[in-house]
Amino acid sequence: MIRTVNLKKLYTTEEVETTALDNVNLDIKEKEFVAIMGPSGCGNSTLLNLLGMLDNPSDGEYYFLNEEVSKYTERQRANIRKRNIGFVFQSFNLIDELTVFENVELPLLYLGISASERKKMVEDVLERMQIMHRRDHFPQQLSGGQQQRVAVSRAVVAKPALILADEPTGNLDSANGEEVMNILTQLNDGGTTIIMVTHSPHDSEFAHRIIHLFDGHVVTENYKEKFHV
C-alpha cells in the first residue's frame, strides 16, 4: 500500500536548515497495523503528515497504492486523500459549531454523496461506535472519550483504506484510551490499514509492527508474528 524511498524533509529559515526526516525507507502493506514511536521532535508527526499528503517531502519518493504521489499537485493529492485516508488526532479537531452528526457527515459532503446516502452512512457508523444517542449534541457537551469516538467515526465514515492516527489516546484517561485502541483494532481486523504515532508502549502493543524513529531516521523495526499478508 505504502512505499517510501529515501524520503527526506527539510525545514529552512533564513539562518538554519533543519532535517526533520532523512532517508526514510518504509514498506507498509494493506491491512497492516503499524505503530511509529520515538521521542518528541524526532520526526513522527512530520512523517505522518507526509504519508497523509498534508505536506510535501523535500526529496525522495512516496508511492501510495502504486502511484508516485510526491510530485503530484495539491489538488491531485487532495483528491487521493479524501477518497482513501482518514485522520484521527490527539486533540480531536472537531468543529465546535457542528453537531456530532454534522461533524461525522463532513467528509461525505466533500465527496458529493447524496443526502439520503449520507444519513445512512453516518447513522451506521454512529451506531457502530455506540455514540448514536449523542448525534444532536455539540462537541463541548461530550466527554473526551466521546469526542474521540466522534473523531474516529468521522475518520472512517467514508470507508477509507488507510487511517492515520496521531497520538489518538494522548488526551484520554486509561479506560477511554483502551476503548479507542480496541476500536482501532476492530477496524484493522475489518481490513483497514492503520498507521499510528504514539509515545505509549502499551498502545504500541496493539500493532503488528513498531517502527522506531530517532533524529529523523528509522533506527529499528520490530515485527510481530500475528500479522500475515
PLM regions with names:
Residues 2-210:
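ABC family nucleotide-binding domain
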Residues 214:
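A cytosolic small-molecule/anion-sensing beta-strand core signal
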